[in-house]
Amino acid sequence: MSRTVFCEHFQKEAEGLDFQLYPGELGERIFNHISKDAWAEWQKKQTMLINEKRLNMMDPTDREFLEKQMTAFLFEGKAPEIEGYTPPES
């Protein structure tokens, strides 16, 4: 049986994550307030950020940058700026 959460990203009830995917308090907040769809959308943005900015996940500074981008995207509705990317027109 799937969990339902009020997704802070989409501002609606949606299917929640199956388990906590990120450590610590932030991970708990994501688990309780972010839907599977919002998390999947973030993973696409995260991959683009890592590739375009050539982030090294072994570097604490790069991990901190990515965490700030994730928080802004999931909870504040701020899309990350990715150089050279033009979103498709609806």
Swiss-Prot record:
Keywords: Iron. It comes from the Bacteria. One of its GO terms (cellular component) is cytosol. It holds the Pfam family Iron_traffic. GO terms for biological process: cellular response to oxidative stress. One of its GO terms (molecular function) is iron ion binding. The keyword DNA-binding does not apply. InterPro entries: Fe_traffick_prot_YggX, Fe_traffick_prot_YggX_sf. Belongs to the Fe(2+)-trafficking protein family. Could be a mediator in iron transactions between iron acquisition and iron-requiring processes, such as synthesis and/or repair of Fe-S clusters in biosynthetic enzymes. This is Probable Fe(2+)-trafficking protein. It comes from Idiomarina loihiensis (strain ATCC BAA-735 / DSM 15497 / L2-TR).
